[in-house]
Amino acid sequence: DELGQRRDGQADVALDVVRSFTDKVISPRAEHVHRYNEDVPEEIISGLAEMGAFGLSVPAEYGGFSEGGQGEYMAMVVATEELSRGSLGIGGSLITRPEILTRALVKGGTEAQKQEWLPKLATAEVMVAVAVTEPDYGSDVAGIKVTAVPATGPEGQAGYVINGVKTWCTFAGRADVLMLLARTDPDRSKTHRGLSLFIVPKPRGDAHGFEFTQNVRDDGSVGKMEGRPIDTIGYRGMHSYEIALENWWVPATNLIGEESGLGKGFYYQMEGFENGRLQTAARAVGVMQAAYEAAYDYAHNRTVFGNNVAEYQLTQVKLGRMAVLIQAGRQFGYEVAKLMAKGEGTTEASMVKAYVCKAAEWVAREAMQIHGGF
């Protein structure tokens, strides 16, 4: 039951369109992809692109649908929730990573970079994986070791060679580019102020591992990129990877902000990550809604001792409490979206992520209990 939701017109339109796509395309394929650890079907990516789901945060002047303001954030939240109701692995997470890069570009990209990349992000011509976490540095982003050092390209162009290892790079096999945070200042005492953000093009790779090479210089030196898949219990379909880069060259024009972006990568990245926390909460609401619907349906169709499971008071209490948490999480997310539209809500975005994800654990467990181990 979704009574009491407070959305605006733009969000309602997004909800109706995405809900139809979720029910017709995503939900029927979700279990098969999860059980067999297959790839996200291309028809899902192309379908979401056709309806404009990847352009919700891309400014209209660059081929997207964003006019700024509250509607943009609300539309993203309701779309993310609805896609996650169908599948977390092949639905809800797909639009998050392009949106993170979009916000980083809007924040710090040059006009040429915006013209080059934002239209491609809006249409899914370019799909993105985020390469920030490293084996020894997760939340401690300021300590990362992957380096980007100035180096000329095969035709003498200015650029950088990237060396090091990134991990938990979701969707990195299928992605066309990595949004990669690297250390451009060797003075580690500068911590996060020595980091810069790059758009790193790559070929599309196999879901179960990939290895690419590139000729970097006239001396025949070769750049290498190798992706090792990390098996996961959930989030199947997008696949996560550990990526090793050795002398992988990128042009200087792919440094977000170009020369003026040196040392500002952490701030550009956080512009995307803050809204990513809100989207994580929205995904959790979608998972809760799916769990509730499955439990509700089962309880009303399963007969035990002559009665439907739903007729027993304990089941009714469980369903009632689940509904309370779902609606609380949903409305919390809406309010944070409104704050973020005003340039506020950084702390609240972390709060809603922490609260709703914890609630989703409980709701999913209660749904399993109602199923009685079925």
Predicted regions and their residues:
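Alpha-helical interface subdomain recognition
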Residues: 1-85, 96, 108-109, 113, ...
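Active-site-adjacent elements of ketosynthase-type condensing enzymes
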Residues: 136-145, 210-215
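A structural signal for short hydrophobic beta-strand segments in well-ordered beta-sheet cores
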Residues: 146-150
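A short core secondary-structure module
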Residues: 158-159, 163-223
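Flexible, small-/acidic-enriched active-site or ligand-binding loops
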Residues: 206-248
